[in-house]
Amino acid sequence: MAIGESELLSRAGDLGLSSHLNFIRRVLRPAVTILRDERPLEVGQSRFGGIPDLPAGATWPTHDDGPYRFLGQLNFTELPENRGFLPKTGLLSLFVADDPSGESEYFWGDAGYISAVWLPDSSTVEPIRSPFSDQEQPGTALSFRSTLDIPYDAEQVDDWPFDEAGSDAFRALRTSLHASDDYLLGYPSHCSLAYDPTPPGSLPFLTLGSDESLDWCWHDGDKLMVFIDSDRLRAKDFSELLADAG
């Protein structure tokens, strides 16, 4: 079930945060929870892993150390209405310069670590296998749910108002908003960083947890966070995505 503001504020009150409701209202952001789905994969459908759907004859993206690895694709027509500045239509395929074999020297903070293929019209796409590997790639269909998000920690706001007990209650409130480690928008979440990873002028775009079944291991089993310049998102320009992990 989608979580709205009234439900969130009710939960905050139940956790003893009634005196901080104005702060919570001020820092609220829309987010979209990403859930795994057991449906069979279809062409053009949102997914993590598997085989990307691209235009016929598309060239597989590469970087200086070799081929990118397919991360997943998002069909924006499948997302709920409460989606911030995310597009209403189109297909976005994401690739990562991550190499489980350890041969690539790309770092998740490097420019170009994430590569994207944006298709405003996905009606003519078809599955395109990587010419660099004949290994079958596990994949899973996705479904989406609207939620709201609040800051992950004190580093993400200028005026953190909580003592230790209040911080614990606030973290419990945030945990209740996320049915998955994977989500769009909101605030980035991590396991080990002592700073706000959001670059200046950028918005959190995608946060992903590590997943052994998909061979995802970000920063020793932590999280991958992808960011986009706010003006580029409004222009549907995904050519310069940034990343961090921790």
Specify the residue positions occupied by each region the protein language model found.
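Preference for intrinsically disordered or flexible, low-complexity segments
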Residues: M1-G246
